Every structure is written in structure tokens, then in C-alpha cells.
Amino acid sequence: VLIIAVLFLTACQLTTAETYSRGRQKHRARRSTDKNSKWTRECTRSGGACNSHTQCCDHFCSTATSTCI
């Protein structure tokens, strides 16, 4: 009877640990997509205001007018 009780408790611990790790993995995936969305930026279309070439979709910012060309 003691051996059966030990086996049952071991099985319960393994099942709980597996379920817990799955839940944490889902949250990790969600966090990584949040981080990725922070890193992606939208570009400014032609005619929009800019300060550098990297802001423009066509990667050309006129320094004279501060607009994307």
C-alpha cells in the first residue's frame, strides 16, 4: 500500500510540473511577441515629416524640407 501511495504522489507531481511548465511557456511566447512588436516601427511615406533617412519608407529624407521624398 505504501509503494502505491508513493507512486501515486510521484505521478501527481510530474503531472503538475508538466502543466505548470506549459503555462509558463505560453506566457513566454506572448512576451516575446510583445517585445517584437515594440521593435517593429512603421515608416513615414513620401511627403511626411522626417529627421533621418531611416524614418522614411524609401529611405530618403530631404534635409532642406525635413520631408520624406
Curated annotation (Swiss-Prot):
Tissue specificity comment: Expressed by the venom duct.
Disulfide bonds: 43-57, 50-61, 56-68
Signal peptide: 1-17
Principal subcellular localization: secreted
GO cellular component terms listed in the entry, alphabetical order: extracellular region
Keyword Disulfide bond: yes
UniProt entry keywords in alphabetical sequence: Disulfide bond, Knottin, Secreted, Signal, Toxin
Compartments in which it is found: Secreted
Coiled coil: none
Pfam families the record matches: Conotoxin
InterPro entries cross-referenced by the UniProt entry: Conotoxin
Keyword Disulfide bond: yes
Pro-sequence residue ranges: 18-41
GO molecular function, one term: toxin activity
Miscellaneous information on this protein: This precursor corresponds to allele E1g. Has not been merged with other alleles since they may differ due to geographic variation (see strain in PubMed:19606224).
Note on domains (UniProt): The presence of a 'disulfide through disulfide knot' structurally defines this protein as a knottin. The cysteine framework is VI/VII (C-C-CC-C-C).
Family: Belongs to the conotoxin O1 superfamily.
Full protein name: Conotoxin Eb6.20
UniProt organism field: Conus ebraeus (Hebrew cone)
Gene: E1
